[in-house]
C-alpha cells in the first residue's frame, strides 16, 4: 500500500500543478481580454458639462448698507505734472505672499513700481526730487505698518500725500492674536476681525468702480475665517464690497443686524484728513479683491495708471486633423462648435474660432472622426484658418530652408484642393518651434510660401511667469504673446481635469484665465482639436469665461483677425517692436526647440566696449597675440567691428551674430571676444548685452575725456569730415544749441562719450561690478604690459602671456607693437598712432571746466566700487582743486 502511495502521489502533485498553471493562464487571458475590451470600446460618456450660466442674482439679498450711501464724488486727480507714474509698495518682506500678489498685478498691468521693506523708525525712503514727487500712489501690504509709523515718518508721508494728491491703499490681515474689535489708530474707523462671512456684493455707489460691474452677488461662504469688516459713522468712508456674517458667527458689537451687509473694503474719500485711501479687510487671495484693487489703483491715480475697457481675444484651435483615434472631433462636435461660435458672437462682436491645420493627417481617425473632418471642411468658410506644418514637424529640425518650404507647400496645396482660405497672414509653428529662439529658415519660408505677417508664441521671453510674455517684430513678421488657458491635448474630460473640475472652474471664475483677460488688452489663447471633441472643454471654458466676464466687469470684448490684431498690439506697445535676444542655453525649453547644429559656445566671453579713441584697438591687437584668445571675424560693413548690439544688425538675430565667431576647440579654455568701441555710451547696449551675455566680462578704457574729445575731432578731420575741416576744435566744443545740426552732432560725439560716470552707471544697472574692468588709458599708453597683466587676471586666462617680452616700443610709429625676431615689429595700421598738433589752451581750459563735475562723479563711483583711480583722473582733480 505504501509503495502504491509513493507511485500515485507524484502523479497527483503533477495534476495539481497543471491545474494551478491552467488557472493562472485563464486569469491572465481574462485580464488581457478585459483590457482589450476596455481600450477598444467607446468610453461611457458622462453628461457634457454645461457652461456656467448667466449672472447670479444682482439684487440685494437682505438689507443694504447700514447707512445711506454717499453720492459719488469725482476722484481727486494727483498733481500729474508733479509726480512720476510710479507706485511705491511697502512690503513685509521680499517673499511675503501678499506682497508678491500686489507686485504681480502691477507687473501684469505694466505699471511701474518700486518696492521697499515697510520702514521702521526714521527709514522712510526719499519721496521727492526737489519739487517733483517720485510716486503717484502708495501701497501698504500691512496697514498697521502705516498706522503705527513714528510721528516724524507719518507726518512726512501724509504731508507728501496731501501736497501731491497721492492716495494710499492698505491691507489689514487678521491673525489669531488680532483684537476682535478695535479702533484704527488715528481714524474714526472701527475694525472687527477674524470673522466668517458669506454672500459678497459690490456697492453700486462706490466711486472707484471702473472695470467692476456693480450690483452683483457672489453667493456662498467666503474662504477662511480671518475676514475683517469696517464700521464708521464718518461720511468719509464709503463701502465698496459688503458681505453678511455666516449663521454661526457671533454678532458684531454695535447696532448691526445679523443680516446686514458689512463692509470688507472701504473707500476713504479724504474728508477726514485730505488723503484718499482704499482699505481692504483681507488680502488678494479672493478673486474679487483683485478686481477691486485694479479699480482702486485707477481711481487713486486719477486714471493715470488705468486699464482700458477694450479687450481683444482670439481663440486658436491647433492641430486640426491631428490626433490619435478616440480624441478627435465628430460631426456632433463640429455642430456644437458652430452653435457655440454663433452664441459667442452675440456677446463678443466678430468672434470666430481660428483653426490651425496639418493636412497630412486628414482622414486618419475613426470613421466617425473622418466624418467630423469632412464636416469641418463643409463649414470651412464659417471659421478662420491658419497653417501648422504639413506633417506637424517642428521647424527647428529643418536646417535646409528649401526642405522646410516644401513642407509648407504641401500644406498649402492641401488647403487649395479643399477650399480652405489661405489669406489670413497668420501661422503658428508646432510647439512654437523656431519662433523664439529664432530659426531664420522658418521666417524666410513663411514669407515666401504663405506671405505670413503674424505669428504667436508663449516662449518670448520665457514661458513662466506668463505675465512677462511680450511681443516683438522680426524679419517683417509680428510676433504676439500667446496665452495658455489650462487646456492641453490630454485635458479632454471634465471630471478628469488635473486637480479636479473645480480647478478649471476656479480658473474661469476669477482665477488665472479670468485675470489673463482682465489684465491684458490682447489675448491669443492656445487650444487643441481634442479640447473640442470628447467633453468639449474648449466650448465650456470660453463660453463660461465670456459670461463670467460680462457678469462682473464692464469689459468690451471683441475679436479681430490676426493682422489687425497685431497692428493694434504694437499701437498699444510700440516699445516692444524691438526684440531682446537672450541666450537659448539658459532656458531648457528654449534649448529644446533650438537647432542642434547651433551652439552657445560661439558666443563671446568678454566684450571690449570702448569708448572710441581711448586705446581699445590696441587692446584688441595685444589680446589677439594670446594663443587662448580669439577675436570675432572682421565685419566688412562697419569698420571691422561687428557693432551688433547698437545698430540695425541687432535685428538680424543671434544666428547672424554668432557667424562672426569660430567654434572654439575647447569651450572652457578658449576665450572668444569682440571689440566695438561704440558700445560704451549707447543707451541700449548694456541691457541688450546683459540679456544675451549675462556672464560676459566687460572691459572699458578711460582716458582724460578732454584728450579723447580732441582725438575724435582730429580723427574726423583725417577722414575728411567737412564739419571738422571747417570749424576749429574750440568752435565745435563750445557750439550753442542754435548752431547747425551737423555741428552739434560732431560736438556730441566729442563730448558725450566723456560722461564716464553716467555711462558706467548704466552698465552697472545690468552687470555686477565684478564683471566690469576699467583700464587706465594713460597706463595703457605708457606701460601696456602692466595693463595686459591686469586684463589677463581679470579674465582668468591661461596660460599667462608675458607682454613685457611680447611688446616693443616702435620709435618711428610712436607706440607699442609686437616684437619680432631681428628687432623687427608688427604694428597697427597707419591710421593708428597718428600725430597731430597739441590742443590749444583755450580748449583745454574749457574742457577742464566742462568735465569737472563728470570727473568728480567718476572718482566717487570708483571709490564705491573699490577700483583704483586712474592717474589722469588724479591729475585732473588736483588741477581742478588748485583752480
Swiss-Prot record:
InterPro entries: Heparan_SO4_deacetylase_dom (IPR021930), HSNSD_N (IPR056793), NST/OST (IPR037359), P-loop_NTPase (IPR027417), Sulfotransferase_dom (IPR000863). It is found in: Golgi apparatus membrane. One of its GO terms (molecular function) is heparan sulfate N-deacetylase activity. Residues 41-597 are annotated as: Heparan sulfate N-deacetylase 2. Residues 49-81 are annotated as: Disordered. Keywords: Disulfide bond, Glycoprotein, Golgi apparatus, Hydrolase, Membrane, Multifunctional enzyme, Signal-anchor, Transferase, Transmembrane, Transmembrane helix. GO terms for cellular component: Golgi apparatus; Golgi membrane; membrane. It catalyses: alpha-D-glucosaminyl-[heparan sulfate](n) + 3'-phosphoadenylyl sulfate = N-sulfo-alpha-D-glucosaminyl-[heparan sulfate](n) + adenosine 3',5'-bisphosphate + 2 H(+). The active site is at residue 613. Pfam families: HSNSD-CE, HSNSD_N, Sulfotransfer_1. Residues 1-18 are cytoplasmic. It is a single-pass type II membrane protein. SUPFAM superfamilies: P-loop containing nucleoside triphosphate hydrolases. Disulfide bonds join 817-827. Its EC number is 2.8.2.8, 3.-.-.-, 2.8.2.-. The chain crosses the membrane at residues 19-39. Its main location: Golgi. 3'-phosphoadenylyl sulfate binds at residues 613-617, 711, 832-836. Residues 598-883 are annotated as: Heparan sulfate N-sulfotransferase 2. Belongs to the sulfotransferase 1 family. NDST subfamily. This is Bifunctional heparan sulfate N-deacetylase/N-sulfotransferase 2. The gene is NDST2.
